């Protein structure tokens, strides 16, 4: 695994350094390092790396490539001398038997890694500290360009004592002779006609370099995408058996692709006016050569996925809109519960339910003559003398389903209480202290002593507090069933028991002088 990783790194580095040899092919490097110094291809690669190093570094030692395995020992001796001069830090390459060091695959890979890293470092240093430019006319780049012009035009080698003016005059004369042999518009008119000075050429060079850097990044990206795509083709089991064939077809074409651009300022000078023509890519003449069968395949109808802002509906509200509360169905003789219920045999009766109570008063939970709950009905004819008149819903023990009828009751009513044609009336608060009730105003052991009826109090606190629910009416005495129960004797005497804080009060016949009549 370690050797495979080293081989991959070496191949990538060789491509970056500009190596164009046969070891870039798939599997070639692995085969060469396995043979080591006995492989001529391995020795050629080492010789190329050393030659590139000698251009940038002052090295005395040199390495020559071999042509046969018999020259392996001589090659290893040369490599040993070179590594000693370069102060190689790897002991496996500088110690041990000289004739056997480079016969091991790992040592061969280590040697290539070391030479490649040294060459990369030397080139970096060369870029950061470029050497002085050679004088014009020597072996510089300018001299090479002028030499190429003379060869292209078929000119003979100029004499050594010729001046630059004479030299360029000879080139101009030769160009005119060559252009006279072709049609007038064969070359075309130049695209750049404006004369340029030194400052202009410097700016043009800077612009060209910026564009070259940008397109170099783009070309590297496209080449990397190509490598990854081709590599993905070999993932399938069927393609793994065709790896060698794929490499033979792909590697030659891949090696031609270079991230470096070949466009220079010379191309700007050579540009002609025909390059300024704008051709529509959709024109008929162009599409004749660029059209393919896939362009004729029409895509089927695609459903509209929406998403337009003007078509999006607002989301539903988090809370439903408030609506007016609708009243429930009206019952036949329903209404509000009478008081807070009644008492049956000295029991406390809830809030009183609806049980066909009259008017707005419920039945209140009474036992034949007990107090009616709430605001019971007032039946026509008012209260009866000596009957067990409940909370407006009984007459002589019978129930009359009558509403609130005019005519009132015999004793009428005032803001204080009701006079039932006899006695009772409104009991003032001065007659007793402590309000006469405990925790809700009900009296225990109340008995209607006249007829044996259990006239237990209905509507503990009356309807909703206040005046005892405005509905506590009971007994022939016509007294107000307010807060706290009261026992009535038909003869007009009261025997009441109020329990409040543990105290008991016994009153007989009090409050007889206050009557309310209609």
Curated annotation (Swiss-Prot):
It comes from Homo sapiens. Positively stimulates PRMT1-induced protein arginine methylation. Involved in skeletal homeostasis. Positively regulates lysosome peripheral distribution and ruffled border formation in osteoclasts. Residues 297-415, 434-518 are annotated as: Disordered. Interacts (via N- and C-terminus) with DDX1. Interacts (via N- and C-terminus) with C14orf166. Interacts with FAM98B. Interacts with PLEKHM1 (via N- and C-terminus). Pfam families: DUF2465 (PF10239). Expressed strongly in colorectal cancer cells. Expressed strongly in colorectal cancer tissues compared to wild-type colon samples (at protein level). Expressed strongly in colorectal cancer tissues compared to wild-type colon samples. Residues 505-518 have a biased composition (Polar residues). Residues 488-504 have a biased composition (Low complexity). This is Protein FAM98A. GO terms for molecular function: protein methyltransferase activity; RNA binding. Disulfide bonds: none annotated. Belongs to the FAM98 family. One of its GO terms (biological process) is positive regulation of cell population proliferation. InterPro entries: FAM98. The gene is FAM98A. GO terms for cellular component: cytoplasm; nucleus; tRNA-splicing ligase complex. Residues 349-364, 383-396, 405-415, 460-484 have a biased composition (Gly residues). Residues 302-311, 447-459 have a biased composition (Basic and acidic residues).
